[in-house]
């Protein structure tokens, strides 16, 4: 499609099979007469990684939270410091071994080398969170079709990860049942509603009073439904499901033990982020600041790709940019990546390219 052959890739994974824990590692500095080296860092992280784990689980990520040198805590980078004893607090993400093997098999069949697995919530974090939010404490909520991936950052470090088996597809199902239409029609209605209502300028209640009926005649649905009541659609169908979603998110935040450490609130991203009533309902249930997260950390992308549904995909590219160097340059300027798309229909091709990677 783009004229580029894919030989390797970073793969995002998420869903209920994801779990996490925090671990502590301790080692003696290899040469106390010299500074702490990168080798010392690797050894202490490996010590933290040495946890008792079932054969059905596999570690996919180990993120250092902070280092402790001779009892001095709160160190973000210990390289170059002097000390005898080096410790580290880490956050470890694990996944189902079976699920990972099945994914590996697919990539092997395609002739694509899997560079690494990355939790999709962490990938989205790379694309939409600011360093300030991470330092203050923030919750990243990636709402996909059938799952919600959650990452909590405290003091600049990933400290908790989980996945909730609930997502935007459940809202679509509710609309299909409530309006007695097919799932395809329900999805079209949901997306159409999201485009019609600007969540950042007025609440859904205000809009519903001004425009009580939503005209969906232009969608040309097979059920021949021309309009629906906004009150029924928003208050009767969508809002109850959103309340349930945010109650699960709230319970997960409380379960993490970091509920009092996230003053930056929630950043909602993913394909379900623009669902009508998302911000209003979230603020009511969670009681914290909430914003919609879009991937704005890259240059050269057309506006259609600066969208919450592409956060995880953009995050994977940014993650790869940190780990792979092509020549002497990274991938910060995406104009060169897209230059081989033909002018005619390039926008559609680009959008379809990204949609291949959306779960």
Where are these regions (language model features)?
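A conserved active-site cap/scaffold subdomain adjacent to cofactor or substrate pockets
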Residues: 165-189
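Feature representing long, continuous alpha-helical segments
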Residues: 173, 232, 236, 240-247, ...
